[in-house]
Amino acid sequence: MDYAKESLRLHEQWQGKIEVTATVPVATKDDLSLAYTPGVAQPCLEIQKDVSKSYTLTRRHNLCAVITDGSAVLGLGDIGPEAGMPVMEGKCVLFKAFGGVDAFPLCIKSKDVDEFVNTVYLISGSFGGINLEDIAAPRCFEIERKLKEKCDIPVFHDDQHGTAVITLAGLTNALKVVGKQKETVKVVTSGAGAAAVAIVKLLLAAGYRHITMCDRRGAIYKGRENLNRIKEEMAEVTNPERRAGSLADMLVDDDVFIGVSAPGMVTKEMVQTMARDAVIFTCANPTPEIFPDEAKAGSAKVVCTGRSDYPNQINNVLAFPGIFRGAFDVRASDINEPMKMAAAQALADLISPEELSADYIIPAAFDPRVGPAVAEAVARAARESGVARI
């Protein structure tokens, strides 16, 4: 199937993938008086006295804003907020289908960090959570940080944290396949953008100790010239040996490669220099850093991609619906590191030891167990970490 051509035809037919529907009837005068004036005044007064009642007297408890500035949409780049709308609508469909979360797309026409943050903050009282989407780095880091400081509801940049959760889940099971331990494996990442930074931070939080990040200039290390603020921060907590050199140099004798960068960054010959039973996450889309057949020809044991036509797809739909479902179920004020790690462990645990293999380390997107398992684990972690409010 020509997905581009057929999708365009269907989008013209659909004229939008979501709609607002009423949950109550308005068929009689009494219906009208209860749903709207004069009866609606009473819940308004109750919320005025206690703002937390906005969660029980309105749909706020289940409503997520999916927000972009259109600056980093898929692999298309800075195409503008209006052009990002089909993706935001699609994300809202996935929230509902896989997590039962009502989501609403908002495309903001500003690339000024403070203007964007203030706009989102001013409307945050309508929502139970905020999902940031397709915002270019490094601006996305500052936007998320400032919103988390200002808002009392969860703020989650899925391009960062959803990808990180799935990667941690996959790597947890990949290491079982190859018989290696997180405390001793050496990990190299290609890319230093939003996804790579979040992946590395979550791996560090989970107990991985030997991680080296690479950008276009090679290894990132403390003291390297011309690092931006985010890379300087990452240099403080990665590459403790201050290894310098190219991506190819860093891969020699290392156990794990995680690519969230660009097509063709890795060759079969580079994989051959890695440690025995190498694990490869090659997640650039639609063309990966190295195709699975090439990686396996280079003796990789486990290979993951961002594509649905190969085994072990790194697909964020496994994470964000269940994460928000769990956060909403306990009215969490934040989505923190313990909640993300709990989501990753729940995903990894769905694959039994009997099922686990090099080609099956991550559950399928349509596995009906995924959403409930992630939601339950996230809700439990929210309670244990003190951010649950019910």
Task: Give the location of each predicted region.
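General beta-strand structural signal in soluble alpha/beta enzymes
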Residues: P105, N131-D134, V155-D158, T189, ...
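Short, ordered loop/turn segments at secondary-structure junctions
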Residues: D69-S71, I79, I108-K109, D134-A137, ...
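Adenosine-phosphate binding glycine-rich loop
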Residues: D158-D159, V178, T282-I390
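N-terminal ligand-binding/catalytic initiation module
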Residues: M1-V155, A375, A381, S385-R389
